[in-house]
Amino acid sequence: ADENEDVEWATEMRLDLIYELNLLSADTEEIAVFSKILDDYENHKDVIKEDDLLWKYKWIWSSTFDIPEIPMEQVEAVGEDYKTRILRNGYSLRSYYQRWSVECTWMRQYDKAKEYIDKMLAEKMDDQSCEACELNFMLDYYLETGKFDEAYSRAQPLINKQVTCYEANLRAYLKLAYYAQKAGKPDIAADMCTRAEEALAGREKDEYLLLYMGLFIAYYLMTNPERGWEYAERCIDWSLRTNTLKKYRFSCDMVEALKYEMRPEVHLALPEEFPLYRADGVYSVSELRRYFYQQ
């Protein structure tokens, strides 16, 4: 497309490529591809509509938070540019505030997160918003601040599939299973586990799910350790080639999960690339926990 100077076709192909790179957690590559798209837009505004780029721009801004080498000042500048572009295309600031609410929750700045959630909810829903994703990320705030009952109540549209998105419903099941078990509600936890297992069927290669699997493993190590380790084997392999944020978050969740494994040793089939690899497949739980803590 570039050789034929077909800018419109090249842009469509690059937007599709960003979708594929997003599934692979290839943040740096995503950003590079989108930078080319923006350059083409600036030089060919008669061919490329800015409105067509904004959904993926939201993803790109999200990716900048995940790369430690990008200073926060630059992340904020990208956010301000995204904000300018959505406003001039007639969108509300709902998606802008939503992204900040997510990042503040991940940074455990819960007061700020709540402020952004309230600002988000005060803005109108539009085509830059995804109700299912908004609900899913809001759950993190309520679950992490100890408000399980409120989280479970708010999650009902996700649980009952009144609102859906490619992964939002599954992510809700995964974390609600863990938090319900922790809250002393094993029946709810078991229900969420069943729903999660159904949704995970056929997604054995979806490595981007790593960010959400750690707490599900923790749930299983509380209730069915063998099943938990089956998922851990898969996810540890994924963690060796994912981005920095996903590796960090998964490691944090595994430190939590391993508190519930009472055996001193476990038998695992892990890849040779794993730093603690053992040919006999026998791993010390304490050494595994130390490894994940150091990550």
Give the location of each predicted region.
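Mature, well-folded catalytic/scaffold domains that follow N-terminal targeting or propeptide regions
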Residues: 107, 121-131, 140, 147-152, ...
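Non-membrane alpha-helical segments in proteins
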Residues: 8-26, 52-65, 95-103, 136-140
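Long, ordered, amphipathic alpha-helical scaffolds
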Residues: 207, 213-214, 218-295
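Long, well-ordered mid-to-C-terminal structural blocks that present hydrophobic/aromatic surfaces
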Residues: 172-228, 233-234
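Residue-level signature for tetratricopeptide repeat
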Residues: 20, 102-104, 140-142, 178-179, ...
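Helix-turn-helix repeat elements of alpha-solenoid scaffolds
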Residues: 1, 25-40, 66-81, 104-119, ...
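Solenoid-like repeat scaffolds
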Residues: 1-7, 38-47, 80-91, 118-129, ...
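Generic helix N-cap/helix-start motif at coil->alpha-helix transitions
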Residues: 10-12, 53-58, 88-98, 125-137, ...
